[in-house]
Amino acid sequence: PAFHRAYDLIAGADMPIETLLFGNPSQMSRAGRSAFYGRAWLFVHMLNSTPEYKEQLKRFLEMVGRGIEQRKAAVEAFGDLGELEKALDRYLKSSLSYRKGSTPLVYRSDIAITALDEVGSRLVELSLARLMGNDLPATRDALAGLAAKAPGNAAVQLELALAERDIAADSNPSDFGPAEQALDRAIAADGNLGRAHAFKALMMMYRLNDQGVDDPAEWKQVRDHIAIANRQDTEDPLPLLAYYESFLYEGRAVPDIAHEALAKAFSLVPEDKTTRVQYAFDLAKQQQYDKAIRLIEFLANDPHDAEQGKRLVAQLEAMRDGVPYLDTPALPVESEEEESAAP
């Protein structure tokens, strides 16, 4: 259990309610952020403790979502903020309640449990090391050694390909050749490994785009790999996103079916920032500005990185209003959805 949160609650006891509602954690000290986290948790806990508070919270979020200034929305939803702060102080000293849910969490039921051999066990260890990203060259070399030991293991080749990709992404210029070669070996070992086909399509996209290739036959091969990946798992967001992006990289107009693929991908991983941003800007390009802005306003209230969300909202508003926006924010370069969902 995170016992240190009890200290955070005490340390944050003198944090004003205005700081919880309107403060920017990214501008706080480490101790300040920790205190903010604990007191903000308590605040949310209190706002979910009674039907009246729940209704106030709902009203506040709805008004902020409509673009009403946060302080005005807070006063209209909660009333006197001084009284709200006193209520929070009293709540801290009370016995906190919890609610036992009778409905289980939603999860995929098609779970397969497999006993791992020596190679599989080592692969899990190296996969986690790659995700940590502390020493990618050393992890890549260890994966190459494992691949030499088990040359016919498609999963090992796929993980080696991802390590090569991660290293290439951090290099200038980027050379995804070694990653693509490892993906070829993975596909040769197991032609039904959907993720290998999906990442192969992505590597091909990068290469063809860099080389300025517009040969329809080459881009058909890209989408052939995507189709194979999609057939293996129609609920995997990665092939859906790759299909959408293939038209962007080729420089072609995005067809309706690709817009639909991106929408489905987002519905599968709404928690992923990169996918959310991609989908929001695709909606904006279709002049669905209000929906696009609502999607990004979610990020503008992210306690860990609200500034990027605010810049993205400003960019979308500029697109809607037909005015230039020069401070174009960089999209996240990489996120966990590359491993579980998206390209």
Q: What residues fall within each predicted segment?
A:
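Residue-level recognition of tetratricopeptide repeat
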Residues: 153, 193, 236, 272, ...
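Acidic/His/Gly-enriched intrinsically disordered linker/tail segments
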Residues: 1-113
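Structural signature of tandem alpha-helical TPR/SEL1-like repeats
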Residues: 134-141, 169-182, 210-225, 251-264, ...
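Beta/coil-rich, acidic/histidine-enriched accessory regions frequently appended to metallopeptidases
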Residues: 66-209, 309-343
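Canonical positions in the second alpha-helix
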Residues: 145-146, 185-186, 228-229, 264-265, ...
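Alpha-helical adaptor scaffolds
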Residues: 162-166, 199-210, 215, 219, ...
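Alpha-helical protein-protein interaction scaffolds
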Residues: 280-281
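Structural marker of alpha-solenoid helical repeat scaffolds
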Residues: 149, 189, 232, 267-268, ...
